[in-house]
A protein has these predicted regions:
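Membrane-embedded alpha-helical hairpins and interfacial helices in multi-pass inner-membrane proteins
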Residues: 24-35, 43, 63-165
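Membrane-helix boundary elements
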Residues: 49-69
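Hydrophobic transmembrane alpha-helices
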Residues: 1-49, 53-56
């Protein structure tokens, strides 16, 4: 599927905006940050399978959402990095194993975010506990909710089958 640069920017911008809105909705229920978090926006992490515009879209959306929520700089920087790593991993899996493409964002967030929680939010030394709680939240958002978002997005974008990009 050949896309113009305008369409790439529009898709990326829409994904970033949707990420911000869904993160703020999650924040209304105190689920967007902290030891136990299930960001609804993370359900969009399957989108790099459908369009490479989702990689910068998700990353910019995370950056903006963390900034708007007043997160410490470590969370803004390293939370965005975790999302970028997960999005790139998902994009790399799009052809060979799209059904498993939810794994990179779960792993990147489960490994990086506990470190952020310990240093930026001064959560007591409980790295393994944080890996489990953040990983479980990511599993719910990416693995469970994301599985349902994927076909809806696929239909909305008019993609019949994942195409090499």
């Amino acid at each position: 599927m050949k896309k113009s640069s305008t369409q790439f920017v529009v898709y990326g911008g829409l994904i970033a905006a949707l990420y911000v809105v869904l993160t703020l909705v999650s924040q209304l229920f105190c689920l967007a940050s902290g030891v136990i978090q299930v960001r609804l926006s993370e359900s969009l992490c399957m989108l790099p399978c459908l369009t490479s515009a989702a990689v910068p879209g998700l990353s910019i959306g995370c950056l903006i959402a963390n900034f708007i929520m007043g997160s410490p700089w470590q969370d803004v920087v390293f939370g965005t990095l975790a999302t970028l790593i997960g999005a790139v991993g998902t994009w790399m899996m799009r052809k060979k194993a799209p059904q498993w493409s939810w794994i990179p964002p779960v792993l990147s967030n489960a490994i990086i975010i506990p470190i952020v929680l310990i240093y930026a939010y001064h959560v007591p030394d409980a790295w393994w506990f944080l890996v489990l709680t953040v990983g479980a939240g990511e599993l719910i958002a990416c693995g469970l909710i994301g599985i349902y978002v994927y076909p809806v997005a696929q239909k909305a974008l008019g993609i019949q089958k994942v195409q090499p990009q």
